[in-house]
Amino acid sequence: MMKNLPEVGNGGGSGFPAVSVGNKKNKYQRMDSDAEESQNHREAEARNSRTRKYVMACAFFASLNNVLLGYDVGVMSGAVLFIQQDLKITEVQTEVLIGSLSIISLFGSLAGGRTSDSIGRKWTMALAALVFQTGAAVMAVAPSFEVLMIGRTLAGIGIGLGVMIAPVYIAEISPTVARGFFTSFPEIFINLGILLGYVSNYAFSGLSVHISWRIMLAVGILPSVFIGFALCVIPESPRWLVMKGRVDSAREVLMKTNERDDEAEERLAEIQLAAAHTEGSEDRPVWRELLSPSPVVRKMLIVGFGIQCFQQITGIDATVYYSPEILKEAGIQDETKLLAATVAVGVTKTVFILFATFLIDSVGRKPLLYVSTIGMTLCLFCLSFTLTFLGQGTLGITLALLFVCGNVAFFSIGMGPVCWVLTSEIFPLRLRAQASALGAVGNRVCSGLVAMSFLSVSRAITVGGTFFVFSLVSALSVIFVYVLVPETSGKSLEQIELMFQGGLERKDGEVELGDAERLVRKEQEF
């Protein structure tokens, strides 16, 4: 009787089409597999989205201190016009007031390296905000030049701490593929602060001389208030946590800031290797190693310190601080029109830094530096020619404003953000905080020297002659980038260290973790 039963799948004796049980089973398996893959893909996309938002929030809050520097640069360019009238300060006092912040901030930067290694990157940012708030409050109520300088000193120390630590922190929490994008946030916020300073100048310029500049300076306190909220959101740097032996805490942070668990574990392994090397080098103090460097560290210092100095000696802070003076030289005499023109400069600077953030990882650091330095050289030379031969007329005013905006645009597309990204990337873990502090010192010293001498030098060789000198220095920066600056895009911080040390084994442009292990063993043998 069993033989007379129709076979399922052959259609015998039944009115149904033949269906194979095996095929039907395979079909359901494929459907289950597709559904599982789709679910896994959705989960991966959701995690990637959460990771990007989390790292972006960390970079955002860590960069708030940089708004303070930008705001001070922008607001002081206009506030000083009213301070001169209210406190009756001289030209030399004006140069000291403007340029001293950069010189004073170097002490904050120098202290920042050791401070951040001791109390952590996160709490160093909090300290920076607190010190700046105190300084801004003192400046806002200052009855004399002397009290104004006391507030300026406190603000400078706070800015030095904040400017040094933000790029280091962001570089240490960011995933490799987007590190350039996130590490450029501090420069974005500096530019945003400059724009806010220019807008504040314009907004409060109609008030009385005694009140206007005080409100302009007091507004600078507001961004630092948000730092308190930031401390509730951002984690500590995983690399600092490993240095302190808190490996589990570091793993938790890396799980939040990397898109895949295996990537987080790989980064943790690299950091632990670097930290082990650091522990083996603790018998040699960091500052001694920086001041008496090995050939490899010397190469890193030349690149990091050199790019920081070139960023400032090409005259960008002179352009921003003294843009009203430059445009007055071109022919604009009305103060309100001068301050309105500076807003255009601030908008240009901010827009182009935003472009740079989206290009810095895809295009690379070095191509942006080429575009930036060559463009700045041309704009500075053309500005020099315009101020010397075409000033005081409509054409001269138009061209001067165009070339000032062009200069800040080319600066913002490359030299502005890439400088800080490179400095935070190229140094090994044991040196990173204090080497970055040393780079920030070079940056602030050069900025201060330019800002404190611009009016005097312009008086001696004219404003046009001063910008001709800046154009020559900018031309030298093109050569510096070509000869010495490496491409760091797409490499982890530990891989960049290996790139400077040489002898790497590369596969499709990547440095294998095995290379790091062999290099650490090799160094520990010596």
UniProtKB/Swiss-Prot annotation:
Q: Does the keyword Phosphoprotein belong to this entry?
A: no
Query: Biased-composition ranges for Basic and acidic residues?
Result: 29-47
Residues spanning the signal sequence:
none
Chief location bin: membrane
Residue ranges of the region described as Disordered = 1-21, 28-47
Q: Which PROSITE patterns match?
A: MFS, SUGAR_TRANSPORT_1, SUGAR_TRANSPORT_2
Q: Which InterPro entries match?
A: MFS_dom, MFS_sugar_transport-like, MFS_trans_sf, Myo-inositol_Transporter, PLT1-6, Sugar/inositol_transpt, Sugar_transporter_CS
What do the Gene Ontology cellular component annotations say? membrane
Q: Where in the cell is it found?
A: Membrane
Q: How does it sit in the membrane?
A: Multi-pass membrane protein
Where on the tree of life does the source sit, at the highest rank? Eukaryota
| Cell inner membrane in keyword set | no
Q: Name one GO molecular function term.
A: carbohydrate:proton symporter activity
| Residues annotated as transmembrane | 63-83, 92-112, 125-145, 153-173, 180-200, 215-235, 300-320, 340-360, 371-391, 395-415, 437-457, 465-485
Ordered alphabetically, the record's keywords are:
Membrane, Sugar transport, Symport, Transmembrane, Transmembrane helix, Transport
User: Member of which family?
Assistant: Belongs to the major facilitator superfamily. Sugar transporter (TC 2.A.1.1) family.
Q: What does this protein do?
A: Plasma membrane sugar-proton symporter.
> By what name is this protein known?
Probable polyol transporter 4
User: What is this protein's gene name?
Assistant: PLT4
